[in-house]
């Protein structure tokens, strides 16, 4: 029998636990990836391994991995996000599907979560070209009326002077928008079940039991996950076939993807590919936007002067109405606030890759198969790029024009998020309508901790009292506990 040895990962990092080995490091990273990695960057520099001994594998679908490397800084971001033939993307489903788990029950995992995140080289270029028409500006602009109607519906359900978990409200709102624009169905309508199942799948992200106990046994989260993917597979295939039979553009993203065709080759997306792309688009358009909105509303609740200036701008331009497409371009302060929020509290803090061949990064040799995590969050908090990096200062964006490798909440290079324009329009519409109508007052003495690996969300939500927009922005400032204070300067 021939024994295969993994190549040695010679990148600096902390030593193994003498008793438990790599396990404590993996658990700490899974519990709080930002809190785990930040001191490593401070100690070892911009390229650091999870452990100097290598052999870790956090998310890669590869059964064998030389180790996990974290990196940050504009030059390293440029290398990893630009050298596509060296740094491959892998599916959103990550290590939930590996060859050792191959079975009919795991078959749907091959399709969902793949999309543009899980294809590389020529296939990625070809698929991105097919998807682009669904995200051209004219097409995105056509979703404005649905976004406004759904936002208005959700806002009308809020009760004045009553507390709400604003994170939960934003998840519901973006779920409805994603379901309507992607599938053509709002919650409660035919076809919306796919969106509801996808939300439950997203909620299982970060469940350690799935990674450590990938066994299809009733009672285990992995078993529940496979059940959800089986349901989703059935629902989505039925929806795709109904739309194919109708052979019409219903105005939603899925309808357009079904009809997409390469002008030169006549190539269309297969049913499996449609499943993969819709899963990725839904996740990106739902969880990411929900967290960006939640963090922005929290930051405004703790920075009353900026909150007042933003509401003044909104009232001056919109006069209490929902924004038109043209008016969205006339809200410069709102855009700066969103940019600063997504810099400080990056909704997607990591960008994962795996090396397809041996390569060099930051002066270190990385073997083939090395898992590489680019820290978007850490790059956004480097003082050499952003003076006073923990300070919420939208004014910095009046003159500062970073490169795409210094500021990349939507990734960078040719793999920049295809739905970035959609997300920014959605966030602007929701904030402009909400802030004109309500003032959200933070309830003091909550513990606000970050949570998540793919996306960063408040672990226990954020409770706020819904007030009429009365301009009393100083109410509810202060009394914030938790590791949020490591990420942003706060009063009190």
What does each model-found stretch correspond to?
Residues 1-108, 119-122, 126, 145-153, ...:
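N-terminal membrane-proximal hinge/A-helix region immediately C-terminal to the signal-anchor transmembrane segment
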Residues 85, 374-400, 479-482:
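Conserved cytochrome P450 K-helix/beta-meander segment immediately N-terminal to the heme-binding cysteine loop
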Residues 24-48, 234, 238, 321-362, ...:
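Conserved cytochrome P450 K-helix E-x-x-R motif and the immediately C-terminal K′/meander segment
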Residues 288-307, 311-313, 421-436:
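Cytochrome P450 catalytic-core helices
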